[in-house]
A protein has these predicted regions:
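Entry/capping segment at the start of metal-dependent catalytic domains
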Residues: 1-11
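Active-site neighborhood of HAD-like aspartate-dependent phosphohydrolases
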Residues: 10, 23-26
Length: 338
């Protein structure tokens, strides 16, 4: 029998809004073929951020879904697997119960990653995409901002070195849950939300006051919504936007309340509730870091899981580069406290 020339790997992400699986065949980090993708929407984040626990009914739903994913993995002959959970599971008071139930019913061991590791995993995938577009951060600065349902990760890269990394608990769903429905519908919501967000941005403003930043790189759950509102291709791997275009959209949204947003942009109420937090957070970040061009990438956390599994295993130079990069961040943190 002819020996297989590739390995089959499955990455599973238990996110705040989606439980996703991606199965690939790979030889090395440059020869990867996606053979299956599954995405199932859940309200995991809303439950955790509001009630601090994952209800039993949702635990059962998650286990049933993962049993289905496990059957698919068996059908595709998956040899390697990584299952990782982020904010919603990380903050659930009954996290251990969920992980035990998943293991008992599926045999899958779930790794719950902390926020710095979550942001770094996503960053590696984004950086790889930017390099493929000829954007490497050499001789200039880039600020990467990843906004998820439960958190905001900010990474400043200058001359291909990580110079600053900070994480904030101000994700989109978390922000939405901080205001009730009546507050979100009011015309004063913009002002209240701006003040709410600005109060957390002081450390970033101070750390980046002398930074020379050419590109603002945006990623995260709601970037597809932003592209849709701008009338741009939501399926593009990389999208470049002039800062003026974004500010025009911000000025338009700034004058609207929730019912008006639904009417103007022809979107569902559940989606419209995320528009103001998303737009206002982006606008506040852009005010912190004046830049002429914004780049949006479609990379997800699951892409980072895949890259960090395959890359170091198949490419020694890439493994060494990751180590060097992590050391640059450690050295920078050390200098900050000296």
């Amino acid at each position: 029998m002819k020996k297989k020339s590739y390995t089959t790997f499955a990455a599973i992400h238990l996110g705040s809004e989606m439980i996703s699986m991606q199965i690939v065949e790979y030889r090395n980090m440059n020869k990867v073929k996606v053979i299956e993708q599954c995405n199932h929407r859940v309200k995991l984040g809303e439950e955790t951020f509001k009630n601090k626990i994952i209800p039993f009914s949702m635990v059962s739903e998650i286990c049933e879904l993962l049993q289905g994913y496990k059957r698919l993995m068996s059908e595709y002959g998956v040899e390697e697997c990584s299952v990782q959970a982020t904010t919603a599971v990380r903050e659930a008071l009954n996290q251990v119960f969920l992980l035990d139930q998943i293991y008992i019913k599926t045999g899958l061991k779930v790794k719950v990653v902390d926020m710095p590791q979550e942001i770094y995993t996503k960053y590696t995938a984004i950086r790889q995409t930017l390099r493929s577009e000829g954007i490497n951060g050499k001789d200039y600065g880039m600020l990467l901002m990843d906004i998820s349902s439960g958190g905001l990760g900010i990474t400043f890269v200058d001359d291909e070195k990580i110079k600053y990394q900070q994480n904030f608990h101000v994700g989109i769903i978390r922000i939405k849950e901080s205001f009730n429905r009546n507050q979100r519908n009011g015309m004063q919501f913009n002002l209240a939300l701006t003040e709410f967000l600005a109060s957390t941005m002081g450390p970033v403003r101070e750390a980046l006051k002398d930074a020379n930043i050419r590109y603002l790189i945006l990623s995260g759950t709601e970037t597809e919504l932003l592209l849709q509102m701008l009338g741009l291709d939501t399926q593009a791997k990389v999208t470049r936007i002039k800062a003026e275009e974004f500010m025009e959209l911000f000025n338009k949204v700034h004058k609207l309340n929730l019912p008006q947003i639904i009417k103007v942009f022809k979107i569902k109420e559940s989606v419209a509730e995320l528009v103001l937090p998303t737009i206002l957070l982006y606008e506040l970040l852009l005010a912190l870091v004046p830049t002429k061009e914004i780049i949006i990438t479609a990379d997800r956390f699951i892409d980072g899981i895949q890259l960090l599994h395959i890359g170091p295993k198949t490419d020694k130079e890439y493994a060494a580069e990751l180590e060097k990069e992590q050391l640059s961040l450690i050295h920078n943190i050390g200098e900050h406290y000296n």
